[in-house]
Amino acid sequence: MLLVNAPVLASERSLTSTISTNPESPDHRNLVSVRAACANGSQVFVSGTLMGIKQTKIVAIDELDLDLKPTSNLLFLRYSDQPGVVGVVGNSLGKLKINIADMQVGRTQVGGKALMALTVDSVIPNDLIQVITKETGATLVRFVNLVSE
């Protein structure tokens, strides 16, 4: 991930970008935050850091803290914190032999808003996304495939 090229890459994709710096980050020496405005009017705020040589981590999405190494295949769920959601997701992926490499769960409070972020070893088909959405009652389920150029 070359952040120096971010404005150029954004411009090439017809995206608007602004860069601001703040020398005060209480938890991380190097922190990059991106706020994206989606076509439907929603926004997402993602923060990442560099922990060491080529050791990037996603450390927050919106107001929820994480510690997740970005890989090629990521799955994100937003849902109300309740027992059983992690099990449903694991079982659903396991039935299709999709291996979970890493998982992080963040929540605002017990029973509050929650975010599950997973790295998996293979692409997740759209029909499985629909099954997970239905069985967990999640308000959002997104599979993200990061491809290096």
List each model region and its residues:
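A conserved regulatory-domain signal marking ACT and ACT-like small-molecule sensing domains
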Residues: 1-149
